[in-house]
Regions:
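Conserved coupling/interface region of RecA-like P-loop/ASCE motor cores
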Residues: 4-66, 83-87, 91, 264-322
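Acidic, serine/threonine- and proline-rich low-complexity intrinsically disordered segments
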Residues: 115, 444-450, 454-467, 472-848
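Hydrophobic positions on the alpha1 helix immediately C-terminal to the Walker A/P-loop
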Residues: 129, 133, 471
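A conserved beta-strand-loop-helix scaffold within acyl/acetyltransferase catalytic domains
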Residues: 343-461, 478-530, 546-548, 565-568
Length: 848
């Protein structure tokens, strides 16, 4: 099939036509289907046509059934009523006509305090009835009418019947009203607005479900396919105005089940309490519920409708059985589902398939028949189910607690990765490898093999009981090889991966001789993980719409984000998010020892880029979600005052603040300056970025970190924090100044160390201990003193010195000369003695 081209990837090229096989087998079960060849020969698959019998129809003399006659009478009774009469003529069934009358009664009442819910199966005319009711509201003078649905494509029928209603009311296009088409490529030129000018300026405007803030001036709000919109979003759309909502109770548009059991039940209770005089949020409102049972597309009881619903699993919501019990998650086991057996059209396999699709639809996934074919034929997709303890003594299907659909990705050649980077084009499939390749310009990651969890759906009666977590945990352990296979041969895998040569088999037998029937000898539907050898993977990834609850779920299982889309979805208003979890594998060198494995550097780069985008792209993101994504470290060990700053932290004040910023921060923490001194004049954003990069070891509480994120990274004011966190302004500023004091304490310590390191220091004298004993030291000093004394005495008794005192003149002067020389000798002796004494005193000082 041509559609198989979309299912093929570089590493998975063989698609199997299970969907077509099941389709042909289902035709044989439909008694109203006739299969013929190009020569109009009835094929053996439609042999039941031989026993066809006419079906009796109750008709009156005019050829009308009883229901058609009642509709004709209703139209004749209201022919003169405006605007009801002209609009009723456009109705095809009696149920549809009564629904339009109910809508118009509440419109003409103009009390704007009614909520009307329209529930029906597919093909009953819900959207057409809403379109005719909107045309009646315009005729009644309503000016502001808003319409919402999961997508504008869901409103094609509604807007078509608005225009048909205008034609019935004699409105002319381009004269009395204009139709505006969407310029968004994703909306495929769907109608998004109708401007009416006949009476006065009137507008019918499409809004997206999450844009409830635009409903300030609305008079009538119409919600089509409300079951496909998350319940909290639908509740946010309700208000003090007229509300019409419709829901399909089967099919892919939504469950209808969640809506009818929760929202409609709540609206009925509020209507009853208001009637009893109890005040509430929506007190005083009237609620009505309309159900359409008569089909427009098919006759009553047409087997084609039931056959189509069974083939495409459109009655999936009716296939959700009640659980027989809720076992503990630790006692549950994960099983691999063999798709050959699942789509074999056997009775038990069909029941199991219907139950699996019921979980998909009840989990508010956007479903279509294409998804069913993807499950059946895509070569890279695999299915797992979480089951409770199986009682083999009972011959019945076990309860399905959780379903996981996995798509194998990766194993892309490096040449393809380089080609994608050079051309900017990405082939279909392999979402996570190509997105990783684009974000980090990395050509190694696409060559790794991984698995992307496409869908995970839990039974509606078992939500938030731990079954989804158990399924993810078992799936991770399975791909890490913790479930050792019982045998090395994988017979089940060989059966599924063997392609069926359909064309070759068709040439062996003609159509008139071919007998189509379910296969025999198929493998078991459910295979325990120990009985199947897992594919060798390096990571598991997920792509989902970013919400706080979903992100915390995946983060709890150690998945880390690497991509968040900058533009929110036009349908849900959510940003797309991709997360990864590395698996324990010996093929990859892990340089880090943390939980992120080889993804550590990429995760840190993502956090850095995300913190920069918080002031722009993600400025309005909920602070709790931003905190969960950044996941800052808020508790640090207090370093000792004598130790140096730890590695990885800020070591220079210039990296964070200027000297003047530090002075202003000091003034604020000393209560000498106002809060705006910090908010405006200090480079506060840079400081908070260092905190969230774990470069500032400042311990903060969760409230303080959240306030700093809003002010420093998202550039929000205190009023915004008051609304988001529900705190008083004084409480916010109190927490803020506490955090600033902690910042100031650390930064002031850094500044003090910088100043201390810049001051000149005196050189230190190194004193080494002596290596000789005290006795040896004393003996050495004594010998030195004795030598000094001898040298001093030798200098005194020097002959040359004494020669100057010798006799050499007249005798008359002899006595005088002798006296002078005697005195000089005495003086020399005294000086020598003094020097000896001083040496001894010095020696004594050294010894002591």
């Amino acid at each position: 099939m041509d559609v198989h081209e979309r299912y093929r990837t570089e590493s998975h090229t063989e698609a199997t036509g299970r969907f077509n096989e099941r389709f042909l087998l289902s035709i044989a079960s439909c008694k109203a289907c006739v299969a013929m060849d190009d020569e109009f020969n009835i094929l053996p698959i439609s042999s039941h046509i031989k026993s066809i019998t006419p079906v009796p129809v109750k008709e009156d003399s005019e050829g009308l059934s009883e229901a058609e006659k009642d509709l004709k009478d209703l139209k004749e009774q209201l022919i003169d009523d405006f605007p009801v009469g002209p609009l009723i003529k456009k109705c095809c069934t009696l149920d549809q006509g009564k629904a339009v009358i109910t809508f118009l009664d509440s419109i003409l009442d103009k009390t704007l305090r009614s909520t009307i819910a329209l529930l029906a199966a597919r093909g009953r005319g819900k959207s057409a009835a809403l379109g005719l009711a909107i045309a009646g509201a315009i005729a009644a003078g309503y000016s502001n009418i808003f319409v919402t649905a999961p997508s504008p494509e869901n409103l094609r029928t509604l807007f078509d019947f608005v225009c048909k209603g205008f034609e019935a009311l004699d409105y002319k296009e381009h004269i009395d009203f204009d139709v505006v088409k969407s310029t968004n490529i994703e909306f495929k030129k769907a109608t998004v607005r109708i401007n009416i000018y006949k009476q006065h300026r009137q507008t019918i405007q499409y809004i997206q479900p999450h844009e409830h803030e635009k409903l300030s001036q609305v008079e009538l709000l119409v919600i089509d396919e409300a079951a496909a919109i998350p319940l909290p979003v639908v509740k946010s759309l309700l208000g003090p105005y007229l509300v019409f909502l419709s829901s399909t109770v089967n099919g892919y548009e939504g469950t209808g089940r969640s809506l009818s059991l929760k929202l409609i039940q709540q609206l009925e209770q509020q209507s009853q309490t208001s009637a009893q005089g109890v005040e509430g949020a929506l007190s005083g409102r009237l609620f009505k519920k309309i159900e359409l049972s008569e089909s427009i597309r098919y006759a009553s009881g047409d087997p084609i409708e039931s056959w189509l619903h069974g083939l495409l699993c459109l009655d999936a919501t009716n296939s959700v059985p009640k659980l027989s019990g809720l076992p503990h998650p630790s006692k549950c086991e994960l099983y691999y589902v063999n798709r050959d057996t699942l789509f074999s059209f056997h009775k038990e396999s069909e029941l199991f398939l219907q139950r699996m699709m019921a979980l998909y639809v009840s989990s508010h996934y956007k479903n279509s028949p294409n998804d069913l074919q993807l499950m059946a034929d895509a070569p890279a997709h695999h299915l797992f189910v979480l089951l409770g303890p199986v009682d083999e003594s009972k011959n019945q299907l076990p309860d399905i607690l959780c379903v996981i659909q996995v798509c194998l990705e990766g194993q892309i050649s490096r040449a393809s990765a380089l080609r994608s980077l050079s051309t900017g084009r990405q082939p279909a499939g392999d979402q996570i490898p190509w997105k990783f390749n684009e974000q980090f310009q990395d050509t190694v990651f696409p060559t790794l093999s991984g698995a992307r969890i496409v869908r995970i759906a839990t039974h509606p009666s078992a939500i938030k009981l731990g079954y989804g977590s158990q399924a993810v945990e078992l799936l991770t352990r399975y791909y890490e090889g913790q479930f050792a296979p019982i045998s090395e041969t994988d017979s089940e895998n060989a059966v599924e991966n063997t392609p069926v040569r359909v064309i070759e088999a068709a040439k062996q037998v003609s159509l008139l001789e071919e007998n189509i029937k379910p296969k025999k000898g198929l493998p078991h539907l459910l295979v325990h993980l120990r009985e199947r050898k897992p594919e060798k993977l390096h990571y598991i990834g997920v792509s989902f719409g970013l919400t706080l609850e979903l992100f915390r779920f995946w983060r709890k299982h150690k998945f880390v984000p690497f991509f968040i889309g900058h533009s929110p979805s036009t349908v849900t208003g959510e940003h797309s998010c991709m997360v990864l979890k590395p698996l324990n594998n010996d093929d990859i060198e892990d340089k880090g020892s943390d939980e992120f494995g080889f993804l550590g550097p990429f995760y840190q780069d993502f956090r850095l880029r995300f913190s920069r985008l918080l002031s722009q792209t993600f400025r309005s993101m909920e602070y709790k979600l931003a905190m969960s994504i950044l996941e800052p470290k808020m508790k640090f060990m207090e370093p000792d005052s004598g130790t140096s700053t730890l590695d990885g932290f800020v070591t220079s004040i210039k990296e964070v603040l200027s000297p003047y910023d530090l002075k202003r921060l000091d003034a604020y923490t000393s209560n000498l300056a106002d809060y705006h001194m910090i908010d405006v004049n200090v480079q506060f954003g840079r400081t908070v970025k260092h905190l969230y990069q774990e470069k500032l070891p400042v311990s903060l509480s969760a409230a303080q970190a959240s306030i700093l994120l809003c002010i420093g990274l998202q550039n929000q004011d205190v009023s915004y924090i008051e609304r988001e966190m529900g705190l008083e302004r004084q409480q916010i500023l109190s927490q803020f100044i506490k955090a600033m004091k902690k910042f100031h304490k650390y930064l002031d310590r850094i500044a003090s160390k910088e100043i201390e390191s810049s001051l000149p220091r005196l050189s230190e004298i190194a004193i080494e201990p002596t290596k000789v004993s005290m006795e040896q030291d004393l003996e050495k000093a004594a010998r030195q003193a004795e030598a000094d004394m001898k040298s001093d005495l030798k200098g005194v008794m020097d002959p040359e010195l004494l020669e100057q005192y010798a006799n050499g003149g007249k005798k008359s002067s002899k006595s005088k000369t002798d006296n002078d020389s005697g005195r000089k000798r005495e003086n020399a002796m005294e000086m020598a003695e003094e020097r000896v004494v001083s040496k001894l005193i010095h020696l004594k000082g050294i010894i002591t």
